[in-house]
Amino acid sequence: KKLALFKNAETVLLPNPFFSFEKIANVTKKEDLGYLLLVSGLGANKDLHTAVDYYFSIPPEKRIPLKILGCGNGVDKVINIINGRDLNNQIEVIGFVSLNEVVTLYSNAKIVWAHSLAEGYGRTLAEAKLTCKNVLCTRISAFREQDDVNIYYYSYYSEFFKNYSYLIENPPHVVEKTLREHLLFETELRKIYE
């Protein structure tokens, strides 16, 4: 009765892309290869220019390598944003990669970083939980909805550096677990089908 819209369908598929990410994450080795993974994009909300400025605000002796993921075919645009500041070749801009490669990048990061002015949902944070990584992120409402022991917020440079420094010295506090979203999804499906 609740699925009347689909009454003529033989099959109803309700996709959830996190299940694919989680399935791969569950069989991917988690390591700390010592890099900061910035999951970003080129949209205005991602504020990539400011994120790169934050990275270069870290004193050089405390800066770990940075990998920037999520800009697809905009690698050249990201290199222009970096604008010759990467004198020690510590930044790698990653173009399009497979989901397996994305999960591996998360799984091997020291810290996952999500810098944004606005999001509809904190996907990067959810994915970091699935790979048992600490997250450094801007204090925006979509990210605060993902609050957990592995999430460290910042609103300004000094807070960014304080949390970055803490995370460099401390291992992740997260254990493998099911996302709250998965539990809610399963609960709602039970309501529909029971």
Per-segment meaning from a language model:
Residues K1-A9:
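A short, active-site helix/loop in glycosyltransferases that binds the activated sugar's phosphate group
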Residues F18, V39, P65-I79, G95-F96:
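Glycosyltransferase donor-sugar binding loop
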Residues K29-K46, V52-Y55, K67:
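Conserved donor-binding/catalytic core segment of Leloir-type glycosyltransferases
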Residues I79-N100:
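Nucleotide-activated donor-binding/catalytic signature segment of Leloir-type glycosyltransferases, i.e.
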Residues V97, T104-A109:
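Short alpha-helical donor nucleotide-sugar binding micro-motif in glycosyltransferases
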Residues H115-L117:
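Aromatic "clamp/platform" in nucleotide-sugar-dependent glycosyltransferases that forms part
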Residues N170-E194:
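A charged, aromatic-enriched C-terminal amphipathic alpha-helix characteristic of glycosyltransferases
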